[in-house]
Amino acid sequence: MGLNLNPILRQELANLDKDTESRKSAMKALKSYVKDLDSKAIPGFLAQVFETKETNSLSGEYTISLYEILARVHGPNIVPQIDTIMSTIVKTLASSAGSFPLQQACSKVIPAIARYGIDPTTTEDKKRVIIHSLCKPLTDSLLASQESLTSGAALCLKALVDSDNWRFASDEMVNRVCQNVVVALDSNSNQTHLQMGLVMSLAKHNPLIVEAYARLLIHTGLRILGFGVSEGNSQKRLSAVQMLNFLMKCLDPRSIYSEVELIIKEMERCQSDQMAYVRGAAYEAMMTSKRIAAELESKMEKGCRSVTGSNFSRRNCSSIVPDYSLSPESQTLGSFSGYDSPVESSPISHTSCNSEFDRRSVNRKLWRRDENGGVVDISLKDGLFSRVTKGSTTVSDSPLVPYDTCENGDEFEGFLMESLRNTTPSPQRQRSRRINAEDFNIFSTPRKLISSLQYPDDVDLDHSDIQSPILRGEREKTIGSRKNPKLRKQFPTMVETMSSTITVSEDTAQTQMITGKKKKKKMSYAKLVIAISFVVVALFATVILMVNQDDDVGYYTVPT
C-alpha cells in the first residue's frame, strides 16, 4: 500500500507550490496520509519529503509542518528518527534566507517532538538523551557564520527551553547553550533580537546558571543598545532594553548590582528616544534598576547597623559620632587594621601578615586607666588588649591573630603597646613596653570592678570596704603614702598600722557576714519546726474531739 501511495505523495507535495486552494487540499491529503502511516514506514516518508522538498519555495513551511503532525500522531515512535529530522531542520534553516515563517515552522517542530516523543514512563536518563539530541544540533548552529542559521537556531532553542520537558536537560547542556548564545550576541547581526529572546527564556527557566553570565550579558545588551541607536534600528533598541529589564527581574540582584548604576544612566538617555514604545520599555527598566539599587542599599545599611548585645559588626561601617566623645562602655573598637575606628594600626612585632579579620564590636569590657592617660581594655570575651586615647592611638592586636601564617615564618614575640602622643623620650617612662597577661587584674565581681574604676591606683587590695567612710579615709591615706615615697619613709610604722587595721577590719566584716548568715539559717529551721509541731497538735486535738463525740452517742430502747 505504501508503494502505491508514493506517486500520490509526490503529487500532493508538488501541489503545495500551487495556488491557495491546491495547497489547502494538498495539506489535507498529506495529514490524512501521515495519520494512516505505519510506524515502520516513517523513515521512508521522511526521505521522500526531504527529496521532493524545495526549501526556497513557498511550500517550505508547509512541508516542515508535516514533521510536527508526525510527532503529534506517532509520539515515541518518532524518537529513532530525531537525528534525521534535526538534520533536515538545520539544512532548512541554513537555506531559509532569513524567512521568518520558515523559521517559525521549524521552531514548532522541536517542542512537539520534546512533548509527544517523551513517554511519561520513560526513565530520566532516556528523557535527558532525547532533550540533548534535540538541543545539541541547534546549540552548535548558534556559532555558525550564516546569520539565517544562527537566528533560526536561536528561535528553535527558545521554543525548546519554554517547553515543559526542558527540565530534563542537564546543567552541562544549559551551560553550553549559555556560552554559545553569548558568543552569538557578540556578532552585530540584524536578528540579534532572536538571540536575546533565547537569553530571556534561559533566565526565566535556569536563573542560577545564567547568573554566572549576568554581567557579561548586561554589557552585551548595553552594547547592542548602542548599536541600535547608531543604526537607527528601533527593534534592536527595544529588544536590548527588554532583555536588560528581564535579567534584572529574574536574576539575583547581587549578581548585577555593580552594573545597576550604568543601566540607570543608559535608561535615562533612552527617555529621549524617538519611539514611544522604546521610551516606555526604558522607563520600566529604569524603575526596576532603581528599585534594585534601593533594596540592596537598605539591606546593606541594616547589615551595617550595630545590634545591641552583638559582638560583631559588618566591615566598612564607619561611625557618625566621633569615637573619642563616647564613653569606654559604648565605644566600638576596630580590633584589627583596615577599618574606620579609633584604631589606626596594629603594631605586632611582625607586620607582614596579609590576613583580614572582621571588625569587632565590643560592648561589655573591663577597663583600667593607664599611667599614660589612656584606657586599657581587658576583654574577657575577645581577649583584646587595647589602649584608647583622645589623640592618635596604637592598639595591639588580639591573640587570635594567626602569627604562624606570616610570610617570614618567624615566631610571635608578644604584644607591643606604644602611645603616639609621647614623642619626646623620657628616662622615667618607656615609650614601648611589652604587655603580658599578668599586668592586668581580672575582677570576680562587679563591685570590685567598679571600685577598681573609682580607685585605679589601688588594685592590690580588696574593695569590699569601700562602703565604710572610716576605711575609705584610711585607704586614701594609705594610697597617698604609697604615691609619696617621702611620707612612706617618714612614717613607716603608721602606714603599716593602717594596713594591718584595714586587714583586721576586712576579716572582721567577713566573719560577721558569715555569722549573720548562720544565725538566719538557724532561725528559719526553728520556725519550720514550730510550724510543723503546731499542725501535728491541731490534728491530734481534732481526732480526740471526734472520738469523744462518738462515745456520747448512746443506744436507747424504744418504749413499748
UniProtKB/Swiss-Prot annotation:
According to the UniProt record, list the residues that bear N-acetylglycine. 2
What single Pfam family name could you report for this chain, choosing any that match? TOR1L1_N
SUPFAM superfamilies recorded for this chain? ARM repeat
Q: What is its main location?
A: nucleus
Alphabetically sorted, this entry's keywords are: Acetylation, Membrane, Nucleus, Transmembrane, Transmembrane helix
Instruction: For this entry, list what GO says about its biological process.
Output: nuclear migration
Q: Where in the cell is it found?
A: Nucleus membrane
What is this protein called in UniProt?
A: Protein SINE1
Natural source organism:
Arabidopsis thaliana
What is the primary gene name for this protein?
SINE1
